[in-house]
Amino acid sequence: MTQENIPVQPGTLDGERGLPTVNENGSGRTRKVLLFLFVVGFIVVLLLLLVFHMRGNAENNPHSYKTMVQTSTVPMRTFKLPPPPPPAPPEPPAPPPAPAMPIAEPAAAALSLPPLPDDTPAKDDVLDKSASALMVVTKSSGDTVVQTTNARIQALLDSQKNTKQDAGSLGTLLHGTQTDARMASLLRNRDFLLAKGSIINCALQTRLDSTVPGMAACVVTRNMYSDNGKVLLIERGSTISGEYDANVKQGMARIYVLWTRVKTPNGVVIDLDSPGADPLGGAGLPGYIDSHFWKRFGGALMLSTIETLGRYATQKVGGGGSNQINLNTGGGESTSNLASTALKDTINIPPTLYKNQGEEIGIYIARDLDFSSVYDVKPK
């Protein structure tokens, strides 16, 4: 376009530079933008068509991808089941039952048996257990064989059991001592019960002398109440009778007394059958012990002294010039024998226990005492 063709704008002067036009440049830039948008839209449409096509193939064959992955990673293996076993042949029909045959008499069967040949092998020696408690002697030989077999089996089992126990196996160590269970119970009517284990305080009325057996008595010094402490059962002043035996031996310092019966001032009587004890509950009654030393050894000592003095006098009268005295020579055998005999007769004298009247003792109740048959409780 020449300058001549450019129209002259109104209001402009000659030689003045005018404003540049933008129409030509603007139209070219618009075409480029439209072309770019067309290309981008075409690409997007192609991508959408490709996605729809792949999704349709996946829906038509959902296992194709998994099959492809498994085929590419793991080789295909075919497992076949073993053939089924052939059918079992049918069972043959059961044969008809045989007719019952009559049982022959034992004697007839024994007669029909052929005799044994002479070259029969010798029987094994059978262990004779006739003296054993397991052997039962009967008239029938069959019973004897059965008893002998049972005895052998029992002996074998016992030997095996003993072998296991002697070996100290773990099985025997895992079994502890078996103890029986005990069942608890309630005391009946404790208002009239003097329970086992109670101790009655008592003062002796009679002197105890263990030279010979004898009877004894004592007086209760303290009231005894029921097991629950509500009812007075044995009043103070009740009399208890008992007995003792002359059983004191060398080295013993107590005597056993059995208290048999108690009688209250109201006339109530009940059997005790309980042992005597000291005030602290120790078994037996202590007392003064006379060991009878001089009675046991006095005669032997006297005879030995007489023998020694006799030998000394014999040596002095004999005129011996020596000042030494030999007490082991000379006669005196008869005197020694007398001393030994006297010692044998007196060495076994038992000691005697003495316990004076008025001393405090105890009685250990060895059983439950029930006073419900003579006492009753009435409300006030």
From Swiss-Prot:
Belongs to the TrbI/VirB10 family. Keywords: Cell membrane, Membrane, Transmembrane, Transmembrane helix, Virulence. It comes from the Bacteria. The keyword DNA damage does not apply. It is found in: Cell membrane. One of its GO terms (cellular component) is plasma membrane. Its main location: membrane. Coiled coil: none annotated. This is Type IV secretion system protein virB10. The keyword Transport does not apply. It is a single-pass membrane protein. The chain crosses the membrane at residues 33-53. CDD domains: VirB10 (cd16429). It comes from Brucella melitensis biotype 1 (strain ATCC 23456 / CCUG 17765 / NCTC 10094 / 16M). Residues 1-26, 78-102 are annotated as: Disordered. InterPro entries: T4SS_VirB10/PtlG (IPR047695), T4SS_VirB10/TraB/TrbI (IPR005498), T4SS_VirB10/TrbI (IPR042217). Residues 81-100 have a biased composition (Pro residues).
